[in-house]
Amino acid sequence: RFLFNYHMDRIFREQPLDGRVLGIEAHYTPTILPGQTKPLVSWKTDGNIDFHEPSVTVKARKGIVIATGGNTGNVEFRRMFDPRLTSEFQLGGGEWSPQDGSGELAAMAIGAALWGCCNQAMNRNGALRRGAFVGSRTSYVAWKPQSPIWGKVKATGLFVGNWQDCIAVNQAGKRFYDETKPAYPNGTCFGFFDKSGGYVHGDWRNSSKIKPQFRNYIDAACAINEGSQGPDWEAGPQWAIFDSAAIKREQWKIDENSGEEGYFFKADTLDELQEKLTQNPYQKFKMPKGRLAETVARYNAFVEKGVDEDFDKPKPRYKIEQGPFYAAWCTVCTHDTYAGLRVNGKNQVVDMAGKVIPGLYCGGESAGGATQHGMGRCFTAGYIIGAEVVKG
């Protein structure tokens, strides 16, 4: 049976930091879309528990399984691993999967340890993604107005097929990297499955065999810049800047669903566009007057020369000169969780002394120590936990 629309807040244990887990406490958190009065309901109703009290406690008969989806939506939590990830970096999919770290925090309160913390910032770097869409906070996934959660998503965004059509600027109104470069180099880009690439699994000489590929877009996007201010020194948002000619080349159809209010702007001049950016809650830095126009003029000069003297964008092709002009949110988003609760081979949660917390299990992105995400990770943990938890 399933109890939906409740948020787990607390785990009970026989002693504050000792003994078996006993149950949980949760509070009622229905999802009500803007303009509606009734909460969203699951498409599956068979076996669901009809319960709407403000809070509930549930006794655990066999055990407790934490599978709360990770912590990259919790700004203070994720900054323990990567201080750069201040609030402007939105969670990809956060509208429907908040990844608030609640499972980790509840387990830590009864003594659980964290694990694999370096993975969050230093491994595949899947925790940070450069979204394919601009103009909406959910830059990682596109949604249509027909979606049942459209009231939370609010915009489809625009898919950028060719970054020769746009430039990306930081909160100070300056370019910061070659816009055509992808994010972090991982997977097949180094010839992992290409014999001609020279890669041999487990061979420490790979780094000398393979020509390095410089793909530091995300590091550049997260770097302290002219607009960063204490105490947190936020990198601030990034904006895709383009003109009407780019819209035709990209074959975009701009309508009321394309961009989210406060994250997509249009103006007749670049100075007017720059002023509108201050309407975004994360654009805290006020650019010097004329900054955006100066940046575009410099880039247009590179187009005339055919050489990007600042960031080596290959043969910049198109000037940004035909109004109206546009600015679309293209800020790097957070995504996968690789740091989480410490578990053993049976997916039992382990405390700071390396001892198992009896009856407590964790799987999926709330469990730490993994360097790979995806359904395989979830299925494997679910299989193991299912076999173990029934033993009581």
PLM features per residue range, with description:
Residues 1-9, 58-59, 117:
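A conserved beta-strand/loop element that lines the FAD pocket in flavoprotein oxidoreductases
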Residues 4-22, 27-31:
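A conserved short coil-to-beta-strand element within the FAD-binding core of flavoproteins
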Residues 27, 60-61, 66-68, 171, ...:
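Short, well-ordered coil/turn residues at beta-beta hairpins
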Residues 32-134:
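Glycine-rich loop(s) and the adjacent beta-strand/alpha-helix scaffold that form part
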Residues 104, 110-284:
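An anion/pyrophosphate-binding glycine-rich loop and adjacent beta-alpha core
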Residues 106-113, 379-392:
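Internal hydrophobic alpha-helix adjacent to the cofactor/substrate pocket in enzyme cavities
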Residues 122-127, 181-187, 333-338, 365-376:
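Glycine-rich phosphate/pyrophosphate-binding beta-alpha loops
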Residues 285-370:
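A glycine-rich dinucleotide-binding beta-alpha-beta segment and adjacent secondary-structure elements
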